[in-house]
Each structure stands twice: as C-alpha cells, then as structure tokens.
C-alpha cells in the first residue's frame, strides 16, 4: 500500500501511464496523488481525465489553474486557446461527464495521518491549516454548484492580493483561488505578487518564493505542490516538495513515493511519435 505523488500532468497521458508502470502502481491497494493541471498544453487531456476518473477512491487530486480554465472554456466564458489542445476533450461524447466530475474535485488535500498537505500552487504564509481548509471548502462549494459559471466569470484578476478574515463574497473567493492555484511569490508580509514568474534567482527584491517565508502549518506537516515548472523540483525547504518538472515542455514527469521518499521520473514523450 504505497502513496505516489505526481506533478502536473498537463495532458501527458503516455508519460503518466509509463511512470505508473515503472512503479508498479496498483489502484486496488496504492494511492495516487496529483498536484493539479491535469489538462492543457500536452496532447492527451481527454485520455488523462478518463484515466484518472476511472481510479475512483485510489485517486487524490487538487485542481490547478489550467483545470479551472477548462471549466471556463466549457461554460463558454473563457477563450479556448489553440495552444491548450483542448478541442478533442471538449468535443468528446463524455465531455459533460468528465468536466462536471472535474469541477467537483478539491483545491486542497490533507492527510492527517501521513501529515501531508497538497495544493496546486502551495499554501500562502498568511493562512494556518484551519483557514486553508475553510477557504478551500468555500471555493469548492461554488465550483460544484449550478452557479459555478458566475464564479468563473469573476474569478480572473490579481486583486485582492492580501488576506484578511474580513474578506467576503467574490473578492474572498478570488483571493483563495489565486492562493491555491496561481501563487508563486510573496512580499515579506505574505501579500501575494501575481506578476513575477521568473526563477527565484531572477526575482526582483523584495519578492520571495512563498515557501521561503515562515508558514503557519504544524511543524510536522509536509507541503506538496506543483505549478512552478521552472523550479525543476529544486530549492525548497526540507518538508516542502515541488513536483512540477515541466513534462509538457519537454522536461520530465516526476513521482515521489512517500513511504521511502524515493523519486521516479519519466522523460517527456510529447515531441516523439
């Protein structure tokens, strides 16, 4: 009964299956954690969704910003960009079933026994674990409701970028969505910077990667995240694991087996026949 954590798949179905074969993943006894961004950019978003949905209770995933963008495209709110390669998925006979399943997935996974917290972009230093759970539930509730297109329509935007318990309504939901799915850098006070996407060594002062600021989670918890491919899985504190290693850009798909902290990789096949 092993726990496998894999970074952003981005439609790289062949790589995902080969990586799972490499570790002898067994859905009847193992658990697969995915850091979000299942879809877009890679060639096989449809097959990725069909496969991960079929895993049932063996799967623990979180939504990423590209997954949310797919919901927007499906609801005819966001633009379908050719570079995202979503047409096959959107035109599939089971598109409604798959996308409605996707929008009912969480933004945050917490395993209190294994002391694991997973979110696509990470956990903002301005939140403790209870606040993160509460904010995730709020966004999940609106995404899984029939009124989710109204939220998607108001989701885009960089403000507010500073957490306050007094935030309400759409501004509160937008902050939470940005923190869970888009965050990279923070100011020293924990305020989000939604502009800089450079590698940490090129980021302007006083910005710091969110994981380099003190967080409010219990000391014995580990944070798993994806989203930030240019990190190449490096440069994080000991108990924070960056698993997006840019498979869809020609990098590798990375898997961490939790029990022995062993890494496995599958090089990108995206540009191969």
From Swiss-Prot:
Keyword field: Hydrolase
Molecular function as annotated in GO: bis(5'-nucleosyl)-tetraphosphatase (symmetrical) activity
Protein's UniProt keywords contain DNA-binding: no
Catalytic activity of the protein: P(1),P(4)-bis(5'-adenosyl) tetraphosphate + H2O = 2 ADP + 2 H(+)
E.C. number(s) listed in UniProt: 3.6.1.41
InterPro entries for this protein: ApaH, Calcineurin-like_PHP_ApaH, Metallo-depent_PP-like
Disulfide feature: none
Function: Hydrolyzes diadenosine 5',5'''-P1,P4-tetraphosphate to yield ADP.
Homology family: Belongs to the Ap4A hydrolase family.
Name recorded for this polypeptide: Bis(5'-nucleosyl)-tetraphosphatase, symmetrical
Species assigned in the record: Proteus mirabilis (strain HI4320)
Taxonomy of the source species: Bacteria, Pseudomonadati, Pseudomonadota, Gammaproteobacteria, Enterobacterales
């Amino acid at each position: 009964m092993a726990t496998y954590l894999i970074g952003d798949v981005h439609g790289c179905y062949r790589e995902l299956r080969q990586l799972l074969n490499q570790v002898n993943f067994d859905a009847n006894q193992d658990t697969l954690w995915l850091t979000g961004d299942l879809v877009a950019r890679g060639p096989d978003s449809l097959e990725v969704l069909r496969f991960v949905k079929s895993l049932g209770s063996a799967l623990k995933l979180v939504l990423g910003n590209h997954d949310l963008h797919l919901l927007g495209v499906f609801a005819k709110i966001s633009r379908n960009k050719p570079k995202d390669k979503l047409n096959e998925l959107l035109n599939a006979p089971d598109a409604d079933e798959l996308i409605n399943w996707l929008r009912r997935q969480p933004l945050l996974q917490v395993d209190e026994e294994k002391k694991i917290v997973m979110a696509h972009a990470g956990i903002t230093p301005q939140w403790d674990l209870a606040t993160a759970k509460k904010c995730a539930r709020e966004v999940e509730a609106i995404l899984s409701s029939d009124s989710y297109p109204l939220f998607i329509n108001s989701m885009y935007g960089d403000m507010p970028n500073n957490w306050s318990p007094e935030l309400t309504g759409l501004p509160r939901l937008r902050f939470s969505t940005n923190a869970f799915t888009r965050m990279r850098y923070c100011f020293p006070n924990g305020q989000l910077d939604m502009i800089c996407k450079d590698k940490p060594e090129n980021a302007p002062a006083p910005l710091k990667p969110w994981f380099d600021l003190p967080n409010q989670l219990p000391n014995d918890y580990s944070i798993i995240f994806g989203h930030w491919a240019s990190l190449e899985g490096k440069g994080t504190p000991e108990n924070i694991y960056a698993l997006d290693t840019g498979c869809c850009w020609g990098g590798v798909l990375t898997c961490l087996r939790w029990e022995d902290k062993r890494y496995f990789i599958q090089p990108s096949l995206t540009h191969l026949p």
